[in-house]
Amino acid sequence: MTDASTTSRPLFNRQQLISLFLPLVAEQALSISIGLADTLMVSSVGEAAVSGVSLVDSFNVLMIQLLSALATGGAVVASQYIGHREPKRAKASAAQIMFIMISLSVVTAVIVAVGRHAILRGIFGSIDADVMRYAETYFLLSALSYPFIGVYNAGAALFRAQGNSKISMLSSLVMNVVNIGGNAILIYGFGLGVMGAATASLVSRMIACFTVMFLLQKPDCALRIDHLTDLKPDLDLIKRILKVGIPAGIENGMFQIGKLSVSSLTSTLGTAAIAANAVAGNISSFLNVPASAVGIGALTVVGQCLGAGEKVQAKRYSRLLLLTAYAGDWLMNLSGLFFLNKLALSWFNLSPDAYGMALELMVWFNAVSLILWPSSFTLPNILRAAGDAAFTMTVSVISMWVFRVAFCYLMVLRFHCGLLFIWMGMFLDWAMRSLFFCVRFVRGRWMEQKVI
């Protein structure tokens, strides 16, 4: 490898970085906006249908997060092999992440499809018969889509590992357009309700999966899988992928479970608080799109630098990416603070109480995000790109459960505080994450990890 004290020519020029990150910003924004549109269309079916879908979606988000984390492990390994100029090992790692994703998602799909009733009862307890009926229908078709989600996530991650984020953006665009169009036809046109929504989602995920796989097999693709025999397990590569993927999966899973635990507190605070929390949460998702996109792209940039042995470049690009994330975060949140918050809230039919609570939450969110969001969520992706996933997992899980979940339960149940203190718990979690991640980054221990 190249000596850590020397650097060759820059591995990424300005145009390459722009070409990588702009499609990621578009993809993230598209994903959030289409998700909102999807929810609005399903809501026309009725309250029981919305309840059934929302229950299943809480499980689906957990599954997608786990699959995405495993794809991250594959992307880190492939990126480092690309940077180290080992194309055969890079291709082999691509095949292994496909093997892992297909195996896990198919097994999970079978378990969920067969045991969906028991799973719903076990997680959510006794629910109304109508809600259960809608939930089981949606859960079955969601389970059938897991293998397609898994393969799509793996393919998109592998394209990003090569520095190509346009493929995942275009695939996401196609998937979401098909999903919305399918919803419109099947829900409004044929009156299929929840089954129509689930079918549209399944078909859109199938199309996205097949599109990514087709493009991954093109002759000019550096990570194409030439033969089905390439998918046979390679224990050494699987171990390297899981070294990053398993901690990231545990981190994402525990984070999602923690969020669900905290969200249950909101339901005890009344209808206005529930509405304010939901609307403020949706709007805030848009504000962090640029910083989130930088974090995803960091897996490619930092991973390839470290694979090439360019530790100096890895640190320089990391600082540049973190600065870029802060610039995007400041642009979005200052815009929110001065005018976007009120504009966005006006799109929702909120009561005066809910509007006031939502606006208060957004102002606090804007102010705290300016300081803490990129160091809490963009920076750990830089550490993961170096293979430091076990550290980010440990910090994130402890911070979530000690500083967010425990704090929120204490403030709401013991001291009878309101919705703002649930968000204060979230901000406290961010502060703790930022502290530990920044110390880790400055000390440089993250660059001592060995992935390949």
Q: PLM ranges: what are they?
A:
Residues 1-24, 78-145, 189-246, 302-369, ...:
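Short alpha-helical transmembrane segments in multi-pass integral membrane proteins
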Residues 14-33, 37, 59-66, 144, ...:
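Residue-level signal for short hydrophobic patches within transmembrane helices
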Residues 19-35, 141, 175, 204-208, ...:
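Transmembrane helical elements of multi-pass membrane transporters/channels
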Residues 47-58, 135, 139, 198, ...:
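Small-residue hotspots at the loop-to-helix junctions and early N-terminal turns
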Residues 50-110, 149-168, 274-340, 373-396:
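Small-residue-rich hydrophobic transmembrane alpha-helices
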Residues 62-65, 179-183, 209-213, 286-289, ...:
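Hydrophobic transmembrane alpha-helices of multi-pass small-molecule transporters
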Residues 71, 141-160, 168-176, 197-212, ...:
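Short runs within selected transmembrane alpha-helices of multi-pass transporters and secretion channels
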